[in-house]
From Swiss-Prot:
Residues 445-464 form a propeptide. GO terms for cellular component: external side of plasma membrane; receptor complex. Belongs to the GDNFR family. A lipid is attached at residue 444 (GPI-anchor amidated serine). This is GDNF family receptor alpha-2. SUPFAM superfamilies: GDNF receptor-like (SSF110035). It is a lipid-anchor; GPI-anchor. Residues 1-21 form the signal peptide. Interacts with NRTN ligand and RET: forms a 2:2:2 ternary complex composed of NRTN ligand, GFRA2 and RET receptor. Also forms a 4:4:4 tetrameric complex composed of 4 copies of NRTN ligand, GFRA2 and RET receptor, which prevents endocytosis of RET. Interacts with SORL1. The lineage of its organism: Eukaryota, Metazoa, Chordata, Craniata, Vertebrata.
Length: 464
C-alpha cells in the first residue's frame, strides 16, 4: 500500500513539474501585455481583415466620438467592443518616429486611447516604441564620421558647436537639409512678419527626423566653454523664427494647442515618458537611458512646443518652450510643474552634459527597478556639475576607454567631476509592457522547487 502511494506521488510530481516548466504556461490571451507590439498601421490592417475586430473597432470609435467617458462606460455595447479590442494587436500597437506613415499610425493609436482615460492627464503614455539604443552607440559613430581624437589641449580651446556644423557640411544629406531649413527660416515674408513659421517648423522636423543623430546631436548638444560657442548652440534651430514670438503664451494654453495635433501630442508624451525625472535611477532618467531622453527632446523641435536654450550661458544648461505661467489663475501650480519638467529637469540636464562629455552610464540597481516614468517627480534632484570640460567631448580616447572596459562587462563615465564605473544593467523590461523581469524570476521556473519541497515532505510522512 505504501509503495503504491509512493508510486502515485512520483507520477503526480512528474506531471506537476512538467506543467510548471512548460512554455505553454506563458502563452494565452490573458497575457496580452506580453505580446510584442505591432505598428498601428499594420495592426489596423490585421483588424480590418477580421470581421469581429473590424466591427468592434467601428463601434468603439463611435463610442469615443462624443468624448463622454461616463456615457461610454455605461453602454454595454461600448464595453463589449473595448474588451474585444483589448485582446487584439490594435490595442497594444505602437509607432516609430519618422516612419513613412507616422501620422496615420498616430491617428489610429489616439483613436483608441484618447477616450479611455478620465479627464485630461498630466502625463500621457507614449505612442512610440521604446528606445533600446544607448549614447555609447552615438559616440562611436560620431567619432568615426568626424575623425575626433585630437590633442586634448587643442580640443579644449575649440568651438565644438562650430566643429559640429563643419562635420554636417561634410555629409551630403545633413548639408542639404540644414541648408534648407536655414534658408526657409531666414526668409522674411514682410516687415511685420519675419518668416513663415509653419514652413520653418516643417523644415526643422525633416532635418531632425531624416539626418542621423550622430550629426544632429553634435549640433544640438555640443559642450561649450565660452559664450560664443553657447550662442551658436542656441542659434542652431534659428530661434527668431522657430521659437520666439512677440509675447509668451501661457504654458498650459500652449500644451492645449499642442495636444490638438496628433504629432505634437505624441512627441510631448514621448518627452515626458523618456525625460521625466525619476527617484529610482542614478542618472535621474527612466532606465538610465540618456539616448531616449535626448531623442525625445529633439523630436519636439518643429512643433508648437519647440524647446530651446533660454540664454547663451556656457556654465549652465536651462531649456524651455516659449511660454510662461502668467495668467494661470488657480492652475498656476500645475503650470509651474509642467514648466519645471523643462527648466529644472535633472534627467535632461544630465543627458545633455553626458553627451557633451562623451560619457554614458549603465548601472545595476540595488533593489527592484520599477517603471521610472510612473514614479513621483523629484522637485529638487542633485544633478551633475554645469561646468564640464570640453576636452573630453566626443574624443576617441573616451570611446577607447569605454570600449576596453565594456569588454570586461563594465562601462565607464570619464567626466572630470565624476568618475564612476558601473556594471551592466541586469534588470530587463519586456518590450511592449510595463512589467519588470528580475533575472532569476522567470515564470516558467518560479515554482518547481517549492512544489518539490512540499511533495518530498508528503512522501516522507506517508513512508513513515
Amino acid at each position: 500500500m505504501i509503495l503504491a502511494n509512493v508510486f502515485c506521488l512520483f507520477f503526480f510530481l512528474d506531471e506537476t513539474l512538467r506543467s510548471l516548466a512548460s512554455p505553454s504556461s506563458l502563452q494565452g490571451p490573458e497575457l496580452h501585455g506580453w505580446r510584442p507590439p505591432v505598428d498601428c498601421v499594420r495592426a489596423n490592417e490585421l483588424c480590418a481583415a477580421e470581421s469581429n475586430c473590424s466591427s468592434r473597432y467601428r463601434t468603439l470609435r463611435q463610442c469615443l466620438a462624443g468624448r463622454d467617458r461616463n456615457t461610454m462606460l455605461a453602454n454595454k455595447e461600448c464595453q463589449a467592443a473595448l474588451e474585444v479590442l483589448q485582446e487584439s494587436p490594435l490595442y497594444d500597437c505602437r509607432c516609430k518616429r519618422g516612419m513613412k506613415k507616422e501620422l496615420q499610425c498616430l491617428q489610429i493609436y489616439w483613436s483608441i486611447h484618447l477616450g479611455l482615460t478620465e479627464g485630461e492627464e498630466f502625463y500621457e503614455a507614449s505612442p512610440y516604441e521604446p528606445v533600446t539604443s544607448r549614447l555609447s552607440d552615438i559616440f562611436r559613430l560620431a567619432s568615426i564620421f568626424s575623425g575626433t581624437g585630437a590633442d586634448p589641449v587643442v580640443s579644449a580651446k575649440s568651438n565644438h558647436c562650430l566643429d559640429a556644423a563643419k562635420a554636417c557640411n561634410l555629409n551630403d544629406n545633413c548639408k542639404k537639409l540644414r541648408s534648407s531649413y536655414i534658408s526657409i527660416c531666414n526668409r522674411e515674408i514682410s516687415p511685420t512678419e519675419r518668416c513663415n513659421r509653419r514652413k520653418c517648423h516643417k523644415a526643422l522636423r525633416q532635418f531632425f527626423d531624416r539626418v542621423p543623430s550622430e550629426y544632429t546631436y553634435r549640433m544640438l548638444f555640443c559642450s561649450c566653454q565660452d559664450q560664443a560657442c553657447a550662442e551658436r548652440r542656441r542659434q542652431t534651430i534659428l530661434p527668431s523664427c522657430s521659437y520666439e514670438d512677440k509675447e509668451k503664451p501661457n504654458c498650459l494654453d500652449l500644451r492645449g494647442v499642442c495636444r490638438t495635433d496628433h504629432l505634437c501630442r505624441s512627441r510631448l508624451a514621448d518627452f515626458h515618458a523618456n525625460c521625466r525625472a525619476s527617484y529610482q535611477t542614478v542618472t535621474s532618467c527612466p532606465a538610465d537611458n540618456y539616448q531616449a531622453c535626448l531623442g525625445s527632446y529633439a523630436g519636439m523641435i518643429g512643433f508648437d512646443m519647440t524647446p530651446n536654450y533660454v540664454d547663451s550661458s556656457p556654465t549652465g544648461i536651462v531649456v524651455s518652450p516659449w511660454c510662461s505661467c502668467r495668467g494661470s489663475g488657480n492652475m498656476e501650480e500645475e503650470c509651474e510643474k509642467f514648466l519645471r519638467d523643462f527648466t529644472e529637469n535633472p534627467c535632461l540636464r544630465n543627458a545633455i552634459q553626458a553627451f557633451g562629455n562623451g560619457t554614458d552610464v549603465n548601472v545595476s540597481p540595488k533593489g527592484p527597478l520599477f517603471q521610472a516614468t510612473q514614479a513621483p517627480r523629484a522637485e529638487k534632484t542633485p544633478s551633475l556639475p554645469d561646468d564640464l570640460s570640453d576636452s573630453t567631448s566626443l574624443g576617441t580616447s573616451v570611446i577607447t576607454t569605454c570600449t576596453s572596459v565594456q569588454e570586461q562587462g563594465l562601462k565607464a563615465n570619464n567626466s572630470k567631476e565624476l568618475s564612476m564605473c558601473f556594471t551592466e544593467l541586469t534588470t530587463n523590461i519586456i518590450p511592449g509592457s510595463n512589467k519588470v523581469i528580475k533575472p532569476n524570476s522567470g515564470p516558467s521556473r518560479a515554482r518547481p522547487s517549492a512544489a518539490l519541497t512540499v511533495l518530498s515532505v508528503l512522501m516522507l510522512k506517508l513512508a513513515l
